[in-house]
Amino acid sequence: MARKIISYNPLKQKRPSILGKKTKRVSDISSKVTQKVIFELNDSLDRLITKYGILNGIGLAAPQINSNLRIAVIQLPKKRVVMINPKVIKKSKDSAVSAICCFSVQRYCGNIEHPKRIKIFYLDEKGKKRTYSVPKKNSV
């Protein structure tokens, strides 16, 4: 079942503490807690895709559903990626500016400067080591 996505209006409210805390590294991918968070992130992402019709580049991180685990789920053009313990291992020095919207900050879309290219190391939901490179303005 999809969890409610934590959101707030920065003009009226303080940021919920879970959104500013450092996440905890996942040590047991097969644990019930980890699997539940992965399921709920996927379910919540499905709900957002249905509601907004966005299919590419939309994603959620565990703190957005009130979990402090280091997990993110991202919808790419042809597949969905579950990233456990993701870490940026390389980023370009050149940058780009893109319009970004955040589901946790109500009504916030803005131009954000970010590296043009990044490389992320992560574990997939089966524990396999993976890397993913974002070559264009779609940097996460």
Task: Please state what every model-predicted region is.
Residues M1-V140:
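Positively charged
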